[in-house]
Curated annotation (Swiss-Prot):
Annotated InterPro entries: cNMP-bd_dom, cNMP-bd_dom_sf, Ion_trans_dom, RmlC-like_jellyroll
Gene Ontology CC terms, in alphabetical order: plasma membrane
Domain notes: The binding of calmodulin to the C-terminus might interfere with cyclic nucleotide binding and thus channel activation.
Domain IQ, residue spans: 609-638
Lineage: Eukaryota, Viridiplantae, Streptophyta, Embryophyta, Tracheophyta
Matches recorded under PROSITE patterns: CNMP_BINDING_3, IQ
Annotated protein name in UniProt: Probable cyclic nucleotide-gated ion channel 10
Sorted UniProt keywords: Calmodulin-binding, cAMP, cAMP-binding, Cell membrane, cGMP, cGMP-binding, Ion channel, Ion transport, Ligand-gated ion channel, Membrane, Nucleotide-binding, Transmembrane, Transmembrane helix, Transport
Cellular localization per UniProt: Cell membrane
Length: 711
């Protein structure tokens, strides 16, 4: 048989089963270790593609397709989420370099924090490793040809050369600019080898290198975020996680602006020192940096660069620090305590970003004004995005509750409009409340109906199979038949005191109880003096009148009439099998050739139990009646024999005394009265010794119709 070209991509090892390749359970989610294991495995295992070409070409094709990763594979999708998180962390690590310059207040010079240099460089290198892995993945990840997306998912391109050309022409340049270790080079290589003031060079180089790399790193996050949402539909699994994700972006922006505020504050103080040094005779610029050996004092800088608020400056010759006055007056630029600097600057950024920069009093310095404008615009955009996205995520957690409130309000208005009695209203409210508690507003049938058939079958097996096997009637069935039954079952709910079916109504479905208790009662067609009730619990079933009707190929279109009334004693959860579905499944019953199923049905059927009990009781009453009649006959025969013997004695004696004649007359009268009483007792037996009218024997379900019976 010839097959068309198959575009499916599978990681397949001929020596192992498919389930062992992925190593994922049905409910398991890949962890970080699992992702790295799958990454390693993905580069070792070639892809398996169906082909119709000659074996030599197949081997060549297998070699060229080696190490190609399926973009729809779960481990790659999880890696994209991890890399997206790593990109956010990278944006948070880069501003740490801005805290390296420190002002030495004692010597009035600029120095560097060597410990922070090493720590920030190591963290930046660790995050860059994620970028390297991502670039390698991009050279090994297949893509869907745009021209093939007219129908379906499109054709997967697995050629390594085509993949490389596509990546080189798209995001490779951005990824390359993002991964360049410019801050590490500045801190660990450039600074130790220059003869100029190290603090000044470090401050300037770090500012430009990090800002230059920030742009491609931010640009790379947007297509990555789009790819994650396109393949998996979501970034976070829960609404609260989504709200936290958007809040973290807002906090990241606060951290970035706080770090920039710190660095520019140091720059403004350094600028003030330079201007003061130019005006002071004998001042050398290089002595403004602590790494230079010097024996001079810079105490004049204290009076030349006072830290005054912009509103307190009356002399135009005084240096205006603008919005950076707070950082200088608080001494945060002079502190060697990193966490003190970090949290103070973070709080400044968060406060002004939330206030949209309204309280910032700037100087006439253009860079400071641009910085304040960027805070205002960024705060406006980020705050709008934060509120909008958090509202969207948080509303998703309450949308079901709102639907429930609207439904309850509509139900109350409808009940009031129709003037329903209070007892019916209570039953409706109780049903809606119980249904909400069980389903949380999710329409399960609609959700399952939109899924593929095989997936729907697996879900139904997961939901119903274990519960069905608790029902003895299903416990002895094979897996194929259970699959057919599971696919047609639908969950139903019954509130307390509600009627499932009434005696004399058509039976439209068979019910299998999973939780709760019911009572099944019958009056044997309304016959006076007859009543039978049986309690049903979990694993019991009712509506068995439908089974003989469904098993009969010649049955009419009219549903059978129920012989029992079934009422819920508590809240009941059950699975229902409708008459049409049972009719379609019944053909598989007839293929079982099993007497065991027939005996099991009889044993657990309420109708068969009732009929069996009535039959046994009737047989017992017949036995008691026959035993009583036999004892009465024996007593009558004994009395007759006594009378006969007395008559013989009377005829043999020719002469008798008056006393003997009186005794004979008394004995004769006693025997006559005893026989009369025996006959009267037989005709007036109590009802428990009489044979009542038996219930109609249930219809025998033909499990082997049109088939030979097993010996």
């Amino acid at each position: 048989m010839a097959f068309s070209h198959d575009n499916r991509v599978r990681f397949k090892d001929e020596g192992k089963p498919l389930s062992s390749e992925y190593g994922y359970g049905r409910k398991a989610r890949p962890s970080l270790d699992r992702v790295f294991k799958n990454v390693k495995w993905g580069f070792k295992k070639p892809l398996s593609f169906p082909s119709h070409k000659d074996p030599d070409h197949k081997e060549t094709s297998s070699v060229t397709r080696k190490n190609i990763i399926n973009p729809q594979d779960s481990f790659l999708q999880n890696w994209n989420k991890i890399f997206l998180f790593a990109c956010v962390v990278a944006l948070a690590i880069d501003p740490l370099f801005f805290y390296i310059p420190i002002v030495d207040s004692a010597r009035h010079c600029l120095t560097l924090d060597s410990k922070l240099e090493i720590a920030a460089s190591l963290l930046r290198t660790l995050i860059d490793a994620f970028y390297i892995i991502h670039i390698v993945f991009q050279f090994r990840t297949a893509y869907i040809a745009p021209s093939s997306r007219v129908f379906g998912r499109g054709e997967l391109v697995d050629d390594a050369k085509a993949i490389a050309l596509k990546y080189l022409s798209s995001y490779f340049i951005i990824d390359l600019l993002s991964i360049l270790p410019l801050p590490q080079i500045v801190v660990l290589a450039v600074i130790p080898s220059v003869n100029q003031p190290v603090s000044l060079l470090t401050k300037d180089y770090l500012k430009f290198s990090i800002i230059a790399q920030y742009v491609p790193r931010i640009l790379r996050m947007y297509p990555l975020y789009t790819e994650v949402t396109r393949t998996s539909g979501i970034v976070t699994e829960t609404a609260w996680a989504g709200a936290a994700w958007n809040l973290s972006l807002y906090m990241l922006a606060s951290h970035v602006f706080g770090a920039l505020w710190y660095l520019i504050s140091v720059e403004r103080e350094d600028r003030c020192w330079q201007e003061a040094c130019e005006k002071t005779k004998g001042c050398n610029m290089k002595f403004l940096y602590c790494e230079n050996d010097r024996n001079v004092s810079n105490n004049f800088l204290t009076t030349s660069c006072p830290f005054l608020d912009p509103g307190d400056i009356t002399n135009s010759t005084i240096f205006n620090f603008g919005i950076f006055t707070d950082a200088l007056k608080s001494g945060v630029v002079e502190s060697h305590d990193f966490w003190k600097k970090f949290f103070y600057c973070f709080w400044w950024g968060l406060r002004n970003l939330s206030a949209l920069g309204q309280n910032l009093q700037t100087s006439k310095f253009v860079g400071e004004i641009i910085f304040a404008i960027s805070i205002c615009i960024s705060g406006l955009v980020l705050f709008a995005l934060l509120i909008g996205n958090m509202q969207k995520y948080l509303e998703s957690t309450t949308v079901r509750e709102e639907e429930m409130r609207v439904r309850k309000r509509d139900a109350e208005q409808w009940m009031s409009h129709r003037m329903l009695p209070e007892d019916l209203r209570k039953r409706i409210r109780r049903y809606e409340q119980y249904r909400w508690q069980e389903t949380r507003g999710v329409e399960e049938e609609t959700l399952l109906r939109n899924l593929p058939k095989d997936l729907r079958r697996d879900i139904k097996r997961h939901l119903c199979l274990d519960l069905l096997k608790k029902v003895p009637l299903f416990e002895i069935m094979d897996e194929q038949l259970l699959d057919a039954v599971c696919d047609r079952l639908r969950p139903v709910l019954y509130t307390e005191n509600s009627y499932v079916i009434r005696e004399g109504d058509p039976v439209g479905e068979m019910l299998f109880v999973m939780r709760g208790r019911l009572v099944s009662a019958t009056t044997n067609g309304g016959r006076s003096g007859f009543f039978n009730a049986v309690n049903l619990k979990a694993s019991d079933f009712c509506g068995e009148d439908l089974l003989p009707w469904a098993l009969d190929p010649q049955s009419s279109s009219h549903f059978p009439i129920s012989t029992r009334t079934v009422q819920a004693l508590t809240e009941v959860e059950a699975f229902a099998l409708t008459a049409e579905d049972l009719k379609s499944v019944a053909s598989q019953f007839r293929r079982l050739h099993s007497k065991q199923l027939q005996h099991t049905f009889r044993f657990y059927s309420v109708q068969w139990r009732t009929w069996s009990v009535s039959f046994i009781q009737a047989a017992w009453r017949r036995y008691c009646r026959r035993k009583l009649a036999k004892s009465l006959r024996d007593e009558e025969d004994r009395l007759r024999e006594a009378l006969a013997s007395q008559d013989k004695e009377h005829n043999a004696a020719t002469v008798s005394s008056s006393l003997s004649l009186g005794g004979a007359l008394y004995a004769s009268r006693f025997a006559s009265n005893a026989l009369h009483n025996l006959r009267h007792n037989i005709s007036n037996l109590p009802p428990r010794y009489t044979l009542p009218l038996l219930p109609q024997k249930p219809t025998e379900p033909d499990f082997t119709a049109n088939h030979t019976t097993d010996p």
